[in-house]
Curated annotation (Swiss-Prot):
Species this chain originates from: Shewanella sp. (strain ANA-3)
One example of a Gene Ontology biological process annotation: cell division
Keyword annotations from UniProtKB, A to Z: Cell cycle, Cell division, Chromosome partition, Cytoplasm, DNA integration, DNA recombination, DNA-binding
Catalytic-site annotation from UniProt: 147, 171, 239, 242, 265, 274
Gene for this chain: xerC
Family indicated by similarity: Belongs to the 'phage' integrase family. XerC subfamily.
Name the record gives this protein: Tyrosine recombinase XerC
Assembly behavior: Forms a cyclic heterotetrameric complex composed of two molecules of XerC and two molecules of XerD.
Predominant localisation class: cytoplasm
Cystine connections: none
Localization of this protein: Cytoplasm
Cellular component, GO, one term: cytoplasm
Length: 299
């Protein structure tokens, strides 16, 4: 570090203490973060002639080292204050750190339900309409990884029983076709026998005892109820079954693109909304990977 740079660092420390009246702890942290950043700058670049591209490179290095978003934010605050100080002092014309931001902390994925617990959850017994309906709902959630809104919006015509598939209207009104496993098809068929006895107002696949389309909240409440009755160790809700579907599929197939297509996820890194995989490939991956859809020889 050049004597000139050291001199400005001392002035910066005094400025933080006297004019900004920051606590000794904050000033100490800022000085440490500046030193940390200067050590990662390329040869020939110091804290006086550093450019925006240099700080971006240092930010990337610190991120790769595993610094938390909170630590990165502290470092960014230090270099931004340093830049403002040099700007006020007439050393630079633009603050090279202005506008830089730390990568957002990734939200933790919800814990998935293991295959054995899923099997226990779906082993509910009973021939009453509500039980048969709820079993069909949970089987379909886990079978096809549908979103809550997608499942609630299904009509009688949405399920193609011969082809073992369901036509879904996802986010942004994007339609996709998703395979449906044998267990789910059987559960839906059992439910439909009871549904015929209910006077229904519309063509909704899943309805209440009064024939109205089942609401999102009702589906969530029923799933939570069955999770408690089956003594699962975690709360059961639609997204947890969707997440479990994705996790178990990836564990079995490792075909990320196919699972993304099945889930109806948009790929933000390209201009295409969906991957170019055809349905035959998706069905093959599904049949070979899904725990409750693997093909078995006819008895």
């Amino acid at each position: 570090m050049t004597p000139q740079c050291q001199s400005y660092l001392q002035q910066f420390e005094t400025y933080m203490q006297s004019e900004r009246q920051l606590s000794a702890h904050t000033v100490r942290n800022y000085m440490y973060e500046l030193q940390r950043g200067s050590e990662l700058l390329p040869e020939g670049v110091d804290l006086l002639n550093v450019g925006r591209e240099h700080w971006q490179q240092v930010l990337a290095k610190l991120h790769r080292k595993g610094l938390s978003p909170r630590s990165l934010s502290l470092w960014l605050s230090a270099i931004k204050q340093w830049g403002e100080f040099l700007l006020r002092s007439g050393v630079i014309e633009l603050n090279p750190a202005k506008g830089l931001s730390a990568p957002k902390q990734a939200k933790p994925l919800p814990k998935n339900i293991d295959v054995d617990s899923i099997s226990h959850l779906l082993a509910i017994e009973g021939n009453d309409p509500l039980t048969l309906r709820d079993k069909a709902i949970m089987e379909l959630f886990y079978s096809s990884g549908l979103r809550l809104a997608e499942l609630a919006a299904l009509d009688l015509s949405s399920v193609q029983y011969d082809q073992h598939e369901v036509r879904v209207l996802g986010k942004g009104n994007k339609e996709r076709i998703v395979p449906v496993g044998r267990y789910a098809i059987e559960a839906i068929s059992a439910w439909l026998k009871c549904r015929k006895q209910i006077s229904c107002e519309d063509n909704a696949l899943f309805v209440t005892e009064k024939g109205k389309r089942l609401s999102h909240r009702s589906i969530q409440a029923r799933m939570s109820k069955w999770g408690q009755e089956q003594a699962l160790s975690m709360r059961v809700h639609p997204h947890k079954l969707r997440h479990s579907f994705a996790t178990h599929m990836l564990e079995s197939s490792a075909d990320l693109r196919a699972v993304q297509e099945l889930l109806g996820h948009e790929n933000l890194s390209t201009t295409q909304i969906y991957t170019s995989l055809d349905f035959q490939h998706l069905a093959k991956v599904y049949d070979n990977a899904h725990p409750r859809a693997k093909k078995q020889q006819d008895k």
